[in-house]
Amino acid sequence: MVFFIAGYPKAGTTSLYDYLGSHPDVFLPEIKEPHYFTEDYPGAREVTTEDSYRGLYRDAEPHQLLGDASASVIHSGVAIDRICERNPQAKFIVLIRDPVAAVRSFHAELLHNLNEEVADFERAWRLQAARAEGRDIPGTCREPRLLQYWEIFDYRKQLPVFFNKVPETQRLLLVFEEFFANPRAGYRQVQAFLGLEDDGRSDFGAVNAARQHRVRWLAETHRKMVDGNGPMYRSLKSGISWLGIHPSDILARFNRKPGGKPAISAAFEAELREHFRPDVKTVEHLLGRRIEHWRH
């Protein structure tokens, strides 16, 4: 059986990937998000061929469930169809978060991975129309569609489609704030959904916490080192790799610091709350209950 931790970005998918990755009856590849089925976000895809995708699972044991934690699946317009055509019995786990908190955290993540360069989220939000037309795209952005923030967290459109396409027995929708208020209970729910025995996990520390670059141009240099892999980099890498040290890692660690979401004004937060109000209502309708954590 195969399963997908299908979304949403910045809603705990990395933590769940980490938890399930240590379960003896689960195999998750080292590449957390291959984005193989997300063909409408080509710049985000880490794996683009069938052979390469299958190769991610070559070390799986016959008894293990095979998982894919590409958080783009839920907001892609094609991924769920592609997956269901290939694996009609596939199961999907979707974590959802207060959309205002999620979109702000996603903006901070895009700043960190260099897909975004506008640190002021309000300005980045207002650039969406221009960017949809191909203007004001950062030179370091690998996939411009990621800059359409409202589109990534379009719960009102995406979740009803998801519910219609995937049978109830093959989908699990979890609320981020509730899951991490009692992660042990949430994790047991996930294990039961996947038909797994409890592995007894008791450590539920946060994974993929918010972070920032100290200096952006150093982050850009780091990406060029890794992507280009030129003669100077290869020479330096071969010279010190026997120590278990990689030059790109040294630079990345030096340039990394803990960081939260950039502050926004009360007026803009109120605007975001109003924008996402229909999305909150959609989620509550699908779950058949209020989500108190999202009420402001």
Model feature map: region roles:
Residues M1-H75, R82-I93, P99-G139, V166:
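PAPS-dependent sulfotransferase catalytic core
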Residues A6-P9, E46, S72-S76, L147-Y155, ...:
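Aromatic-acidic/polar surface patches that form glycan- and anion
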Residues V26-F27, Q89, M232, K281, ...:
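A general structural signal for well-ordered secondary-structure junctions
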Residues K32, P160-A270, E274, G288-H296:
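The conserved 3'-phosphoadenosine-5'-phosphosulfate
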Residues F37, Y155, I291-W294:
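Short clusters of hydrophobic/aromatic residues that line enzyme substrate/ligand-binding pockets
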Residues V47-D59, E116-D203, N229:
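PAPS-dependent sulfotransferase catalytic domain
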Residues Y53-L56, A79, Y155-L159, G186, ...:
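Alpha-helical packing segments of well-folded alpha/beta enzyme cores
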